[in-house]
Amino acid sequence: MSSTILVIHGPNLNLLGKREPEVYGHLTLDNINQQLIAQAEQASITLDTFQSNWEGAIVDRIHQAQTEGVKLIIINPAALTHTSVALRDALLGVAIPFIEVHLSNVHAREAFRHHSYLSDKAIGVICGLGAKGYSFALDYAIEKIQPSNPN
């Protein structure tokens, strides 16, 4: 395995499959992670996953990614999307490109969910496509970090 991609899941995503399945779907976080790991393995990419309900732990994991040589971060910051300058600063501080993912369409929900502290710095934002959004983000990430085929 060559390059590394880190997938970060924010607060309450450990409750996937139980919490508001009509909004977030029926897959568990473990289901999603296993699908992503298998998808990355097919491309000979190392994929690490991390979930925390604690903002500081997520910031620490972002900092750690820089020392590990992570090439790209896929992050679902969950509720921290709308509140965390610390996450924004951590992502900018490590200068690792990132894709922001949301299971639900945050723009079709409550007004307070419409603003993201990360979107303007992300290389892309995917929302409203459920767990497939992670898969689409990973497809793009793999394409972005793998060397071009010279043929």
From Swiss-Prot:
- Residues the entry annotates as binding substrate: 76, 82, 89, 103-104, 113
Catalytic activity field: 3-dehydroquinate = 3-dehydroshikimate + H2O
Tell me where on the tree of life, at the top rank, the source sits.
Answer: Bacteria
Gene Ontology biological process terms, A to Z:
amino acid biosynthetic process; aromatic amino acid family biosynthetic process; chorismate biosynthetic process; quinate catabolic process
Please indicate if the UniProt record lists Lyase as a keyword. yes
Q: Keywords of this protein's UniProt record, alphabetized?
A: Amino-acid biosynthesis, Aromatic amino acid biosynthesis, Lyase
Similarity field: Belongs to the type-II 3-dehydroquinase family.
**What is the protein's quaternary organization?**
Homododecamer.
Q: What is this protein called?
A: 3-dehydroquinate dehydratase
Q: What is the lineage of its organism?
A: Bacteria, Pseudomonadati, Pseudomonadota, Gammaproteobacteria, Moraxellales
